[in-house]
From Swiss-Prot:
Keywords: Cytoplasm, Nucleus. The lineage of its organism: Eukaryota, Metazoa, Chordata, Craniata, Vertebrata. Component of the integrator complex, a multiprotein complex that terminates RNA polymerase II (Pol II) transcription in the promoter-proximal region of genes. Its main location: nucleus. It comes from Gallus gallus (Chicken). It comes from the Eukaryota. Although strongly related to RNA-specific endonuclease proteins, it lacks the HXHXDH motif that binds zinc and participates in the catalytic center. Its function as endonuclease is therefore unsure. The keyword Nucleus applies. This is Integrator complex subunit 9. A motif (Nuclear localization signal) lies at residues 566-570. The keyword Transferase does not apply. Coiled coil: none annotated. One of its GO terms (biological process) is RNA polymerase II transcription initiation surveillance. InterPro entries: Beta_Casp, Integrator_9su, IntS9-like_C, Metallo-B-lactamas, RibonucZ/Hydroxyglut_hydro. It is found in: Nucleus; Cytoplasm.
């Protein structure tokens, strides 16, 4: 059993598990933090960005001034943002049989895998994961394609050039794996390979293993996966939550009795309480609006935004914000809000019951009906007619490198009345803001991450008690910025096995058993022999038939009849020859009785010596030695076959044949 780690990002995993002749990819997350090294893509020409000076190296060289620009002490690539792909050279990805997706954030690299590696297998995911994943990909493609860049920067990626650059470009890793965004035809082709599954649905893979998705409690349709054979069980836990938000609660019971538990996707901000962050979000939003400022919330079009809108629904009136407009701007805003209302079966119990009242599960439906929340595909068209200030705008992308958020950062960044509130934990907010400096608007960091923290993980592992835990190396040591916090790491016994990008782990669990069926007619022919009270054994002479990883014992073929004619026999008519079996022996040889038997048969001067494993019987006159051990007996005599046969027969009198 081997695990190939293709991603270095613990919350955007991509691993490949080789288990029982199947090759299973576990998620294909796309590391977008690489985009922080690029300049933003403004929707309209930005004089500020276009006037940024080109990079001059320490030796005065200016050959990179077209590719790299300086802004407030930072260096950025002036090109279309690129994303860090999972490893594609560690193993041949065309050999991957299936891809299991745990949630919509962990499928963003899917088009790169399915369309560029020769992959011909099947992808399994739940319906909400596929539909919302499609929305995220569509928004990503739309945001980048609508702002085309004339130039493409690649010279700086040369290793000899990169080492001359200032940080963080100098320290950027895996730049050879950075790629431009895929296209919508590639997205559609990738999604066409997905087969929809439901929670607890058992899927057979080639008769070798069975995979089952379980609710992980993190997002709509998010899943953990059980991968098991008849005697082995691997649990894949990725992006799970024990908090009561909108998705179905996490299924923990099914994770018990795992031989190996692969753990990824823990919270990125273990010291922040999600409830406290929501409270800070609401209070900072209200304070800004009361002072006449605007609030910008960079976000994804699904997920935390549903919970934020629900909190604001309860908070608006009490905070005196009834007349403040809320705008949700995304090319997929309408689809996202509608999908959240129709996936009732994937919601927590409280929201499911509302569907049968009938009421919309999420209160943002009422916010839309009362015109308190308005959604638009972009800042053009209807939005420009309806736009009123002060207001609150939810829009993407959280990296601040593309999407409508770039326009509002340029528009509102010069006023200290305005506030940008970061709620998504995927990007460093200081790095996200770097190309907008100097910035007058206030910045508030309220990261909301409902995934498991280390205390919850420790409790979970004690409850499910896996034999072995495997996790990213980041989880086996405290965060670099808080090296004294030993509580911010996984603590379990035995210690977890850790992995890093481009590593191959040989998992410690080895297969011990294989299930074999026996045909009824063969079972009827067996004659068990009792060798101990309550224990019977029978020898089996059979033919093993294996197909689709299922093994069946069948009656041995009958000996072939001699041909009645001189026709040539076809190869397919050949029947494997079944040789007669030698009888098996069981039992033990009582040494004292054996010596008496030897003496009765004319052997004198018999001596017995004890050994660590049994006894040695010496027949001194015959110069013969008999080794008697727990699981074997050896007769050693020089070139005297009649004597050996006689002694063998005496030994056999004490053993049972079957």
């Amino acid at each position: 059993m081997k695990l190939y780690c293709l991603s270095g990002h613990p919350t955007l995993p991509c691993n490949v598990l080789k288990f029982k002749s199947t090759t299973i990819m576990l998620d294909c997350g796309l590391d977008m933090t690489s985009t922080l090294n690029f300049l933003p893509l403004p929707l309209v020409q930005s004089p500020r960005l276009s006037k940024l000076p080109g990079l001059v190296l320490k030796d005065g060289s200016t050959f990179l001034d077209k590719e790299l620009k300086e802004c407030s002490g930072h260096v950025f690539v002036d090109s279309v943002p690129e994303f860090c792909l999972p490893e594609t050279e560690l193993l041949d990805l065309s050999t991957v049989d299936v891809i299991l997706i745990s949630n919509y954030h962990c499928m963003m690299a899917l088009p790169y895998i399915t369309e560029y590696t020769g992959f011909t297998g099947t992808v399994y995911a739940t319906e909400p994961t596929v539909q919302i994943g499609r929305l995220l990909m569509e928004e990503l493609v739309n945001s980048i394609e609508r702002v085309p860049k004339a130039q493409s920067a690649s010279t700086w990626k040369n290793k000899e050039v990169q080492r001359l650059l200032p940080a963080p470009l100098k320290d950027a890793v895996e730049v050879s794996m950075w790629r431009k965004c895929y296209t919508m035809p590639e997205v559609n082709a990738a999604l066409s390979k997905i087969q929809l599954v439901g929670y607890s649905q058992k899927i057979e893979l080639f008769g070798a293993v069975q995979v089952t998705p379980l609710s992980s409690g993190y997002a709509l349709g998010s899943s953990n996966w059980i991968i098991q054979s008849h005697y082995e069980k691997v649990s894949y836990v990725s992006g799970s939550s024990l908090l009561t938000t909108h998705p179905q609660p996490m299924d923990q019971a099914s994770l018990k009795n795992s031989d190996v538990l692969i753990l990824t996707g823990l919270t990125q901000i273990p010291t922040a309480n999600p409830d406290g962050m929501v409270g800070e979000f609401c209070s900072n939003l209200a304070m800004t609006v009361r002072n006449g400022g605007n609030v910008l919330v960079p976000c994804y079009p699904s997920g935390v935004i549903y919970d934020l809108l629900e909190c604001l629904y309860q908070y608006i009136d009490s905070a005196g914000l009834s007349n403040v407009p809320f705008y949700f701007i995304s090319p997929v805003a309408n689809s996202s809000l509608e999908f959240s209302q129709i996936f009732a079966e994937w919601l927590c119990h409280n929201k499911q019951t509302k569907v049968y009242l009938p009421e919309p599960p999420f209160p943002h439906a009422e916010l839309i009906q009362t015109n308190k929340l308005k959604h638009y595909p972009s800042i053009h068209g209807d939005f420009s007619n309806d736009f009123k200030q002060p207001c609150v705008i939810f829009t993407g992308h959280p990296s601040l490198r593309f999407g409508d958020v770039v326009h509002f950062m340029e528009l509102w960044g010069k006023s200290s009345l305005n506030t940008v509130i970061f709620t998504e934990p995927d990007f460093s907010y200081l790095d996200a803001l770097a190309p907008y400096q100097p910035l007058a608007m206030k910045c508030v960091y309220c990261p909301i991450d409902t995934r498991l923290n280390f205390i919850q993980v420790s409790k979970l592992l004690k409850e499910v008690q896996p034999l072995h835990v495997v996790c990213p190396e980041q989880y086996t040591q405290p965060p670099p910025s808080q090296s004294h916090r030993t509580d911010l790491m996984i603590d379990c016994q035995p210690p977890p096995m850790s992995y890093r990008r481009a590593e191959v782990l040989t998992l410690p669990y080895k297969r011990r058993y294989e299930k074999i069926e026996i045909m009824p007619e063969l079972a009827d022919s067996l004659v068990p022999l009792e060798i101990k009270p309550g224990i019977s054994l029978a020898t089996v002479s059979a033919m093993l038939h294996t197909k689709d990883n299922k093994h069946v014992l069948q009656l041995p073929p009958k000996p072939p009849q001699p041909p009645t004619s001189k026709k040539r026999k076809r190869v397919s008519d050949d029947v494997p020859e079944c040789k007669p079996l030698k009888p098996l022996l069981s039992g033990s040889i009582p040494v004292d009785q054996f010596v008496q038997t030897l003496e009765k048969h004319g052997f004198s001067d018999v001596k017995v010596e004890d050994t660590a494993k049994g006894h040695i019987v010496l027949l001194q006159e015959a110069e013969t030695l008999i080794q008697i051990e727990e699981d074997s007996t050896h007769i050693i005599c020089d070139n005297d076959e009649p004597l050996r046969v006689k002694l063998r027969d005496l030994v056999l009198k004490f053993l049972q044949k079957f």
